[in-house]
Design a protein with these regions (language model features):
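Membrane-interacting alpha-helical segments
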Residues: 18, 34-45, 102, 106, ...
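Cytosolic juxtamembrane amphipathic/interface segments immediately preceding
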Residues: 47-65, 119
């Protein structure tokens, strides 16, 4: 028995299984493997965008998800294959002949797929138990993966609903601010409350299923980063305007929800965002006298600019109708 193959196989299995269950069941983000595969996949998409254009973003989330699934399969398949290969006589065919390299690879694949053809069998009690355990794991793997992807799809629907809600509220920050003030008061209160609920829900989904971050769209009007930036700037206009408005307290609560989301973005997606230290000053606010307020506003603009900058947008896209 080859101890090196056995050791490497076990290490690969432990890494893959931990990453799989942490990502799909913990609701606390992604494992080390999934996180790095996501970052790498996104960088590949960014290269493709330069070659094929913005339409490539329509495949961003799909590509990241498939790459994560492929990495899990590859690690588990490879790890189990190495464990079986650690003992050349572990797997035999129906005639008792020892399986060769390709036959062990085939046996590993149909063990994980729970196919159970029966033309190859493990020869020892330990490998029989191992085969049974990973046949059961294969069933859990595919059902848990589908459940996870359904949860991601639900989170994606909420993200796009939020983006659409902001877009229909106004096409520029000033238009959003103007509409909030000019709408019927009961409708405005309702809109602020609904936006807060959608943002809070998206923040929770974003933390539980970080892959949602990578689902982008090619059209500017549908871009989540564009619309969330416009909303944040609109709230800044309303909160730092010289004129008082009756929605100030409600807007502060909405602002707080946005702040939590932006902080999570900065903490967990800094490598995917083009965050700069000094974002462009889009507006000057006469009532913004506090240094702390200036720093807070600059910080959130840096994060927001990093968000839409990662999709090759600029502040001009935020302030111009699309």
């Amino acid at each position: 028995m080859s101890g090196i193959l056995l050791f490497i196989g076990i290490i690969l299995l432990v890494i893959a299984i931990h990453d799989f269950f942490f990502t799909t069941l913990s609701g606390s983000g992604t494992g080390f493997v999934s996180r790095n595969i996501s970052i790498l996949s996104d960088k590949i998409i960014q290269v493709c965008v330069k070659v094929f254009g913005q339409k490539t973003y329509n495949y961003n989330g799909l590509f990241v998800n498939l790459m994560i699934l492929f990495s899990w399969l590859l690690l588990i398949w490879g790890g189990l294959f190495l464990v079986f290969s650690s003992n050349p006589e572990a797997i035999t065919n129906s005639s008792g002949k020892v399986a060769n390299f390709w036959e062990r690879l085939y046996f590993t694949s149909y063990t994980l797929s729970t196919l159970g053809m029966g033309d190859f069998t493990p020869s020892t009690a330990i490998f029989k138990m191992l085969t049974g355990a990973f046949s059961f794991f294969g069933f859990i793997f595919f059902t848990s993966s589908m459940t996870y992807f359904l949860s991601v799809a639900s989170a994606l629907v909420n993200k796009r609903t939020l983006s659409k809600s902001i877009y229909h509220l106004g096409k520029t920050p000033r238009e959003i601010a103007k509409n909030i003030l000019n709408f019927d008061s009961s409708f405005t209160y309702q809109q602020i409350s609904e936006l807060q609920n959608l943002i809070d829900k998206h923040a929770v989904n974003h933390h539980a299923y970080p892959v949602v971050h990578f689902y982008r769209q090619s059209k500017k009007r549908d871009s989540f980063s564009i619309n969330i930036a416009r909303l944040d700037e609109a709230i800044s206009i309303l909160l730092y305007a010289e004129e008082e408005n009756k929605y100030r307290e409600e807007l502060k609560v909405l602002r707080s929800s946005l702040s939590d989301f932006l902080e999570d973005m900065e903490k967990n997606f800094a490598s995917n965002l083009l965050i700069q230290k000094n974002a462009e000053n889009s507006y000057s606010f006469p009532t913004l006298h506090s240094k702390d307020d200036e720093k807070e506003l600059q910080k959130r603009r840096n994060i927001v600019q990093g968000l839409f900058g990662s999709e090759n947008y600029t502040w001009d896209d935020i302030f111009n109708k699309s």
